[in-house]
Amino acid sequence: MITFCIPSKNNLRYLKSCIRSIQQNSHYTNNILVFVDQDEDGTVQWLLDNDIAHITNPDKDCKGIGYGYDAMFKASKTDLVVAFHADMILGPDADKYLVQEHTRGSVVSATRIEPPLHPPGPEKIVKDFGMWPEDIKWEDFNAFAKAQSKANEGRLGKTSFAPWLIDRRDHLGHDPIFLSVFEDADLFRRFVLAEYTMIQSWSSLVYHLTCRGGQFAGAEKLEDFQKKDEKWLYSNQVSMLEYVRKWGGMFKEFGPCEPRPNVKYNIGAEVLNCTEDVLSLEPFLDQLKVDCSYTNYLNTQEGKSSFNIKDKFVNNLTTDIVIKLDAASDGSLEYFNYILSNIEDTMQQVDQFSTYEFGPIQIAVGKKEPVAIKITIHDTDL
């Protein structure tokens, strides 16, 4: 037996079909647990009426999907838990195939079948079984999923994406700096750092209505998919910068949805004739020594970051690696941006305790040791 853990934020319309699919298509007699982050659509009452176990957000502010999963994993009465989304429909026996591939120290993801809203990819199947929960072609989907499961039995990949199954004793905890965007990118890369086995089962299938609680939240008609939710776009931008601050760069992949941890270095920059464009690269840096005012930049970041950005600005750099540039020199900003965006490749070209010039940029390398990323995060408030 496993526990399907489903975060919900005013997702009752989708949650009904999601839970129906788990109840009808599970191979095992499984538990269902819902984390209600926000309820303005009668979610809690419906769960009570249908005797579905749930946890409610204790605060008025939304906690986010990561907090929800951590809370549900802790409350689960089974060790095997599945991180599921409210806009997903479970395929026949999908749970059996997840369990079949699982061992301690592994994370097993199902394969998504999606309607044609996003570009196709080698890690998923694009096929339309309905765009809305009320229009799901249940018989067609179940028949297709059964046939695909049989045809792909034993076929495995390395993609990581919800839904994913794990023994809750192996869970590393979500980082609270990522509210509901990039939280999985961060977690999956820590799974890889912990040397977990990342598995995708092509026999375990779900139909994913695609981001109805995120970038397409509130979509009511097809035209709504032409524009992403404004709140999601804002959260995505904020979380992207937080990811860069933590990991040292944008997230990387070995293949589509195959997480590759970043290699972060301790980097500072000394900048003459500093500009706002230079300051905007702050997320890539641990320290900055500049000759311009950075008050306005700090104001633009206020309340958006869990990092102490103000303390990054110093009079003397103490980082392992120091980059020096004159922002007034031709091409310096382009070189600076390129070096920071490709820092792992740059570090492959240099030796420690050496100085190098890349165009108008000077790099002084002291220690060339990666920064250790904290792998396990547990919220003691849960």
Which role fits each region the language model picked out?
Residues I2-Y14, C18, N25-S26, G268-C274:
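A conserved hydrophobic helix/loop-capping motif in glycosyltransferases and polysaccharide synthases
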Residues R20-T29, L281-Q287:
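Short, acidic, metal-binding catalytic loop of nucleotide-sugar glycosyltransferases
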Residues T78-G91, D320-A328:
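Short beta-strand-to-loop acidic/aromatic patch adjacent to the donor-nucleotide binding site
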Residues I89, D93-W132:
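Conserved donor NDP-sugar-binding/catalytic core segment of glycosyltransferases
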Residues G157-W164, D170, F178-L205, T210:
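A short, conserved alpha-helix in the catalytic core of glycosyltransferases
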